[in-house]
Regions:
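Short, well-ordered beta-strand segments in beta-rich or mixed alpha/beta enzyme
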Residues: 2-9, 41-71
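Short alpha-helical
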Residues: 13, 64, 76
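Short amphipathic alpha-helical segments
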Residues: 14-40, 78
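Short, charged/polar low-complexity linear motifs in solvent-exposed/disordered segments
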Residues: 22-23, 35-37, 57, 73, ...
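Glycine-rich loops and low-complexity Gly/Arg-rich segments
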Residues: 28-34, 62-66, 80-85
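Glycine-rich beta-strand-turn "strand-cap" elements at beta-sheet edges
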Residues: 39-52, 79-94
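Intrinsically disordered, low-complexity terminal tails and linkers in eukaryotic proteins, enriched
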Residues: 68-80
Length: 94
């Protein structure tokens, strides 16, 4: 099993809209594609006073599922979120 972690840094000006998008659209889309174990948490950091930080962890049972998340689902997220929020939401996988 693999855990795919994505960290998000969200500017306050788009925070509420982005949070609604992730919780009402993106996470349900992940679950609909068969990824039942999804953990979404806010990360508190002393260095993050000017933005909100979140972590999204998705369990992938095998390398095929991992590739689906990284190659397809995150690309879909990037296209949609990029159009909605631009550079006001930064994210990276680890």
């Amino acid at each position: 099993m693999y855990i795919v972690n994505t960290s998000f840094m969200v500017e306050p000006s788009v925070h509420d809209r982005w949070l609604k998008f992730v919780t009402e659209k993106y996470i349900p889309a992940l679950r609909a594609r068969g990824f039942g174990k999804v953990v979404f948490t806010r990360v508190l950091s002393v260095d993050a006073e000017d933005h909100f930080t979140y972590s999204l962890q998705v369990n992938a049972d095998d390398m095929e599922a991992y590739r689906l998340i990284v190659d397809e689902l995150f690309a879909e997220y990037a296209a949609t979120a990029g159009a909605l929020f631009g550079q006001r939401v930064l994210w990276f996988n680890s």
